[in-house]
C-alpha cells in the first residue's frame, strides 16, 4: 500500500510504497490481519519500504511468508507431496518447495486456466489424480469443502496442513478422514 498520513518523527513519507507484515491495526474490516481493510494504522517501524517500481507485486511478500510458514509447520515431516490450489499462494508454495527441498510436487487445481503456468511441477485437476499415497498435503485452495475429496488420496497417517484463506468454515466428513488414520 501507500502511506497516506504519517507523524513528523517517522522515517517515511506520504506516498511511500510499503508492505506491512502481519498487521492487526485495521480500521474498517474485522478479518485476518486486516488484509481486506481499506486502511491500516501501524507504527512506522513495522513498515517495510518498497521500491516505487515494485508496483503491486509487493503483496507477494505476504504470500511468500504464508508459504514459508506452512512449510515450517511441516518441516519435521518433510515437504508436501501434494499442494491443493494453484493460485498465487499455491504457485509460491510449489516453487519454494522445489527450491528449498529439491522435491517436485504435484498440485491440484480445479480451474482450467489456473492449471497453466507451472514451472517443472505437475498441475492436475483433482479428478485426474489416481494416487492414494499422499503422506503430506498442504491446502492453499481456500475451498472450504476440498477435504472430502482430498482425504481419499491420503496414505494412512497422512498430515494435512491448512494454509488457505477460507471464505466459509472448513467442513469435512469425519468418518472418512478417521478411517485414513
Language-model regions: role of each:
Residues 57-128:
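Mid-domain Rossmann-like dinucleotide-binding core that forms the NAD(H)/NADP(H) cofactor-binding site
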Residues 111-114, 144, 167-168:
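Helix N-cap at the beta1-alpha1 junction of Rossmann-like dinucleotide-binding domains, i.e.
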Residues 129-137:
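A short acidic, Gly/Pro-enriched loop at the edge of an enzyme's catalytic core
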Residues 154-155:
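Helix-to-beta-strand junctions that scaffold the AdoMet/dcAdoMet cofactor pocket
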Residues 159-161, 172-181:
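Rossmann-fold dehydrogenase core element
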Amino acid at each position: 500500500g501507500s502511506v497516506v498520513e504519517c507523524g513528523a518523527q517517522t522515517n517515511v513519507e506520504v506516498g511511500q510504497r510499503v508492505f506491512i507484515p502481519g498487521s492487526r491495526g485495521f480500521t474498517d474490516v474485522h478479518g485476518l490481519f486486516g488484509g481486506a481493510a481499506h486502511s491500516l494504522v501501524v507504527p512506522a517501524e513495522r513498515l517495510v519500504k518498497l521500491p516505487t517500481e515494485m508496483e503491486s507485486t509487493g503483496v507477494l511478500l505476504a504470500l511468500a511468508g504464508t508459504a514459508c510458514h506452512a512449510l515450517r509447520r511441516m518441516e519435521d515431516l518433510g515437504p508436501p507431496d501434494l499442494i491443493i490450489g494453484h493460485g498465487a499462494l499455491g504457485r509460491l508454495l510449489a516453487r519454494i518447495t522445489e527450491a528449498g527441498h529439491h522435491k517436485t510436487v504435484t498440485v491440484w487445481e480445479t480451474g482450467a486456466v489456473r492449471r497453466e503456468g507451472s514451472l517443472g511441477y505437475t498441475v492436475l485437476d483433482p479428478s485426474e489424480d489416481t494416487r492414494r499415497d499422499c503422506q503430506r498435503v498442504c491446502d492453499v485452495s481456500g475451498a472450504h469443502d476440498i477435504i472430502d475429496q482430498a482425504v481419499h488420496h491420503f496414505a494412512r497417517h497422512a498430515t494435512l496442513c491448512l494454509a488457505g484463506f477460507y471464505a466459509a468454515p472448513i467442513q469435512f466428513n469425519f468418518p472418512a478422514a478417521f478411517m485414513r488414520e
